[in-house]
């Protein structure tokens, strides 16, 4: 497993966890263009993403989420309250938002 910090700080947060078969983003606080560039350096593309997990709704964690979801159908997971805030503040409709289960096995 590899962990690649694509961006960190108040201007955007985005971390990729990946191996040979799976790729998951933690937060999408960068533009889709910057994400494409960062993934290309790792020999990946957006279509390789299996999911995006959003830790919370602050803009530095979701800045590029709306644009990404307009063009790609990557499932987005987070807590119910976070998903509701994102839907309201970012005016999201018809995107692939998924509620995380409240317990994990």
Model-derived features with residue positions:
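Metallo-beta-lactamase
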Residues: 80-105
């Amino acid at each position: 497993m590899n962990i690649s910090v694509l961006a960190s700080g108040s201007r955007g947060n985005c971390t990729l966890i990946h191996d040979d078969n799976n790729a998951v983003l933690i937060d999408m606080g960068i533009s889709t263009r910057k994400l494409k560039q960062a993934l290309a350096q790792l020999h990946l593309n957006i279509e390789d993403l299996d999911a995006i997990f959003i830790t919370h709704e602050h803009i530095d964690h979701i800045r590029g989420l709306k644009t990404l979801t307009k063009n790609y159908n990557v499932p987005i997971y987070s807590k119910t309250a976070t998903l509701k805030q994102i839907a309201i503040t970012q005016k999201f409709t018809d995107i692939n938002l998924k509620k995380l289960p409240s317990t994990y096995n």
